[in-house]
Design a protein with these regions (language model features):
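Viral structural modules
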Residues: 1-214
């Protein structure tokens, strides 16, 4: 008599009938659970573009007739999850988006030039992440030897961000005396991996020079 075969699929059938495509008994699966989510469309404006030194010197030299937007590319997303005090189970998710902005600068004399720089946008949301506080221990099987003990883990929430590249609609040059120069336009630290996307060059973050906003 041929052996009965259990095919992967939902639990179904009766009288322990596995030929119907189901399991004879439930199977436990260790997986992640989605506790909460949100979705939004953002229309960003007045975002400063931090230029490389050579592009900044071109703006400071003057003689710029116009600046046109070309493209925007998402380079990286930095996520920080922290527990909300006095609100059990809820967490703040701070998200920082790093964009490469490319613009075309037309000079009064000479041909147009392409410049690029870094734009940063911050967003914060509050989501439910579960109330569990379990610690998880696991091991890796080794035959005829002591199993490897893996690093302990926990069921703390993990944030996942899905985003598409933006569409650049406008760009303009702002003189330092008319820009706000407030904390909303400040950039105090740029990760090394982001700097490498601009050839490892120094990004100008001071507010006393001509600036590009998108």
């Amino acid at each position: 008599m041929a052996d009965k075969v259990c095919c992967p699929g939902p639990i179904c059938g009766s009288n322990n009938n596995a030929a119907g495509g189901g399991f004879r008994e439930a199977v436990c699966v260790h997986t992640k659970k989605v506790y909460d989510s949100c979705r939004s469309k953002e229309c960003l404006r007045d975002i400063r573009v931090f230029l490389c030194r050579d592009a900044q010197e071109l703006l400071n030299a003057g003689g710029i007739a116009s600046v046109k937007p070309r493209s925007a590319e998402l380079l990286c997303v930095k996520i920080d999850v922290e527990r909300v005090q006095f609100n059990r189970g809820f967490y703040t998710v701070d998200i920082r988006f790093f964009y490469r902005i490319e613009c075309e600068v037309s000079c009064v004399i000479g041909r147009p030039r392409i410049i690029d720089g870094l734009a940063v946008f911050d967003k914060r949301v509050i989501l439910f992440g579960g109330e569990g506080g379990a610690r998880i221990f696991s091991s890796r099987f080794i035959e005829d030897d002591t199993d490897i003990q893996l690093c302990p883990d926990s069921n703390k929430p993990t944030a996942v961000v899905e985003v598409v590249d933006p569409i650049l609609l406008d760009a303009r040059i702002v003189s330092p005396d008319t820009s706000c120069n407030c904390c909303c336009c400040a950039l105090h630290e740029v990760p090394r991996s982001i700097c490498s996307c601009f050839g490892g060059g120094h990004l100008v973050v001071s507010g006393d020079e001509s600036q590009v906003f998108v």
